[in-house]
Amino acid sequence: MIVQEIGTRIEPVLRKYDVSFAGLFGSRARGDERPDSDVDLLVAFHRQKGLFELVGLERDLSQTLNLKVDVVTEGALSPLLKSEVLKDLRPLYGQR
């Protein structure tokens, strides 16, 4: 699945959860994914969300794409991973 297709398919879910930004990182952003690779998304919200909303977002995105989706916020990234995530980041939705 190409990056643009992922963005188009998940946009309604992102709107539902009041996401202000979503970007793809990891193997799918680099183009070296395997068929069973998950979808890694960095997201930001218009206002803070709780754990249940994050889990719901992951579940709905996974169902929409028929792939495992991992969602992370920038604040939850370890400093060691942050630079790697930002290097791979491919914006899909909204503004950072």
Indicate residue ranges for each PLM-predicted region:
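Catalytic core of pol beta-like nucleotidyltransferases
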Residues: 1-21, 29-34, 46-96
